[in-house]
A protein has these predicted regions:
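A conserved beta-strand element that flanks and buttresses the S-adenosyl-L-methionine
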Residues: 27
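Conserved class I S-adenosyl-L-methionine
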Residues: 4, 54-84
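Class I SAM-dependent methyltransferase SAM/SAH-binding core
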Residues: 1-14
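A short glycine-rich, Lys/Arg-flanked "PGG" loop and its adjoining helix->strand segment in the class I
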Residues: 39-54
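A short His-aromatic
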Residues: 33-35
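Short amphipathic alpha-helix with an adjacent loop that forms part of the alpha/beta core around
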Residues: 13-21
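Boundary detector for helix-to-coil junctions that initiate low-complexity/charged tails
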Residues: 137-180
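Short alpha-helix
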Residues: 75-103
Length: 180
């Protein structure tokens, strides 16, 4: 028996990696709270699923609060009265209500404290419901990705960084020369 092909990708752009409603199971474990837009990651995952496909989430509760919003910890994943919430200081979304009609959401806080959500896509409709369309905007996505790439390029090719890298290389090269 052959195992299914396993794909990896950024949840916020998952439908670019997994196309044509082809996936039957997508798992996101302790990653949504580290992403730039976790609700978009959920919706992109649902776009990639076939009808009846499952998005399985397993997260530590409210990590951004615990980590004081440092580094990648910018969002909290929580369960309230059996419903899934994504929130931070400025933003709170009841994901269960947001996805109503497009997907069913079963959320539970486990004995170990983890938040487990099983989200099942109800339909294979090509058109996203209006309340979900605002999270998926290809033009905006391209702009954001270009901005990230340009910032990365700037941060890694600035004159100061080039000089620093050049000096570091020369020092390393000199040490190696004398070590031989």
């Amino acid at each position: 028996r052959q195992l299914p092909q396993i794909e990896f990708g950024m949840s916020e752009y998952l439908s670019a990696f997994i196309q044509n409603n082809d996936a039957s199971l997508i798992t996101i474990q302790n990653a949504l709270d580290h992403s730039s837009t976790p609700v978009k990651g959920i919706i992109e995952s649902l776009i990639s699923l076939r009808e009846g496909g499952i998005l399985y989430l397993n997260h530590h509760p409210n990590e951004a609060e615990m980590e004081k919003y440092k580094g990648f910890h910018q969002y909290n994943v929580d369960e309230r009265n059996g419903e899934l919430y994504i929130w931070n200081k400025d933003y709170c979304i009841n994901v269960t209500k947001l996805l109503d009609g497009f997907a069913s959401v079963e959320t539970k806080r486990m004995d170990n404290g983890h938040i487990i959500a099983i989200i099942r896509k109800k339909t294979e409709q090509n058109e996203l419901p209006i309340q979900l369309q605002t999270y998926v905007d290809d033009r905006k996505d391209k702009g954001e990705l270009c901005q990230v790439l340009l910032q990365f390029q700037y941060n890694n090719t600035s004159l100061l960084k080039s000089i620093r890298n050049s000096i570091s290389f020369r020092i390393f090269d000199t040490i190696q020369f004398f070590a031989q």
